[in-house]
């Protein structure tokens, strides 16, 4: 996700390099599945990713921040006929996509045609400007409370930090863990500020 990459490159990497100038910190951007695979085969030390699942069955997972998903629309929930509803989703590889698809099917009894696929930050901007409807984390819509329509039961959405549970990590990684946690513990609350 571009928002995660931006925060890691501008906030996490400089602070970590200042604390540990002799340690090389490499940042790769991959899908959630690729990150998990890299952690499982020990080609990466830590992963930060979004998930609709609170934990991974093998990886040691820690929730950095959490939110619930809401239907985002300028109109009353389901007031527009399905054929006039512009549905926007994240791309199919994004972990949020499967949950968006499931929830749209639950709301409309079918998966409506998608008018746009984009990163959450772009969907946020488009919905804010009345371009279409989407499903996003609730706190991202804090500045647009009338656009939030809560779903029951409220589906969770999590920002996860994970690593392999039996891999021996050098002591310096505790500093990285703390830095990641401190940086991302209020990610969803500040999402709107980042992309306004």
Regions found by a protein language model. Give the residues of each.
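Short coil/turn segments
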Residues: 1-6, 52-53, 68-69, 74-78, ...
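A generic structural signal for short hydrophobic patches within well-formed alpha-helices
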Residues: 5, 13, 78, 123, ...
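Generic non-transmembrane alpha-helical segments
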Residues: 7-19, 103, 175-190
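Short beta-strand-centered segments that line the small-molecule binding cleft or hinge
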Residues: 11-15, 33-69, 73, 147-150
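Beta-alpha-beta core module
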Residues: 56-62, 66-67, 125-176
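Secondary-structure junction motif
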Residues: 85-108, 170-173, 177, 187-194
């Amino acid at each position: 996700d571009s928002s995660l990459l931006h925060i890691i490159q501008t906030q996490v990497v400089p602070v970590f390099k200042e604390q540990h100038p002799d340690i090389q910190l490499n940042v790769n951007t991959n899908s959630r599945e690729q990150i998990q695979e890299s952690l499982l085969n020990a080609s990466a030390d830590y992963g930060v990713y979004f998930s609709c699942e609170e934990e991974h069955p093998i990886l040691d997972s820690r929730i950095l921040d959490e939110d619930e998903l809401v239907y985002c629309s300028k109109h009353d929930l389901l007031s527009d006929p399905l054929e006039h509803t512009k549905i926007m989703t994240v791309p199919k590889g994004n972990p949020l996509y499967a949950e968006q698809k499931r929830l749209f099917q639950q709301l409309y009894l079918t998966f409506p045609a998608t008018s746009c696929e984009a990163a959450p930050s772009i969907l946020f901007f488009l919905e804010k400007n009345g371009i279409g409807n989407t499903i996003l984390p609730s706190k991202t819509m804090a500045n647009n409370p009338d656009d939030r329509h809560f779903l029951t039961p409220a589906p969770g959405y999590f920002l996860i930090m994970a690593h392999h549970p039996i891999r021996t990590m050098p002591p310096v990684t505790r500093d990285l863990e703390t830095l990641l946690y401190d940086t991302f513990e209020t990610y969803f609350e500040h999402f709107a500020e980042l992309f306004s």
